């Protein structure tokens, strides 16, 4: 099945949205850093915890996760800090 959108694996990281995990206090300098990045093609990359298995049995009726997709959870502070950097339409 052809999907109307596909992730482009050759897109490069352009800029961080919001503050770094260190600035927000959501990391202890380990490699576990939640983050949101705009890619050079306009898409966004989210670094967070993969909770696909934990949520699989309790998705809302109109939500589905394809085999190549994951449910990624980030701290609220990460998204709130990015709000002013998210481009408008």
Region spans (language model):
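Short, charged/polar N-terminal "headpieces" of proteins
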Residues: 1-31
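Glycine-centered structural positions embedded in regular secondary structure
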Residues: 18, 47-48
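Short amphipathic alpha-helical surface micro-motifs
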Residues: 26-29, 53-57
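Short, surface-exposed polybasic-aromatic patches that bind anionic ligands, especially phosphate groups
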Residues: 32, 46
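Short, surface-exposed charged micro-motifs
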Residues: 35
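Short acidic-glycine loop/turn motifs at beta-strand connectors
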Residues: 39-42
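Surface-exposed, flexible loop/turn segments at secondary-structure boundaries
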Residues: 44, 52
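Helix-rich interaction surfaces within compact, conserved domain-sized segments
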Residues: 48, 55-89
